[in-house]
Amino acid sequence: MGIISALVGGIMDATRIAKTNKALNELTYEEVVVQNKYAIKMPSFLSPKSNLNEDASLQYASRILDIAFLVIDEPKSEFIAAIEESKEYIPGLGDSLLDNLAAVTIHNMFDDKDIETGNYRQTTINGLNAITLNVFQERTFLKDALYASFAFIEGKDTVYQIIIMSGGTSIKNFADKLEVTIQSFREL
């Protein structure tokens, strides 16, 4: 059994490396318009999905590359009301809409357990106020860590969360390509 597992693992690793190289060498972007709310340029190495997150208005992923890309949008007024209800349960919430969105999202996804955050940056994306940051979580039950990159964007009447997750290290190979996608986001 051990030899077969090693062979299958080696074949899977070789397949992943070949797919990664192909994705990097044949990269193109396609603009996707979602519900006439926003547009974003998606990389060719990700494919549309519909079963990753029921709240997401845009879902793309690559199983072989172990990358998921989601956009969740919600009315700003609903989020502000939810923040007021959450202030007693989530420490550190303040007056900044985007900081609160980041805190609530990370709290809900990771439960604040054993995470490292980094690369926090206040910025603008096509004229909209935004925050970007990365999260890393070691997972003892699997050999890989969980990597996530976020962009929290304040639109006119809507807040947007761009969530990119990977259970493997392939996200490092695609970080600059995914950054192009984040920076292409525009509200319509």
Over which residues does each language-model region extend?
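N-terminal targeting sequences that direct proteins away from the cytosol to non-cytosolic compartments
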Residues: 1-77, 107, 111-116, 121-128, ...
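A short acidic-to-branched-hydrophobic micro-motif
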Residues: 61-99
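Acidic, glycine-rich loop-and-strand cores that form catalytic or ligand-binding grooves
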Residues: 96-109
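Short beta-strand/loop turn elements enriched in aromatics
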Residues: 97, 153-154
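Generic short beta-strand segments
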Residues: 134-138
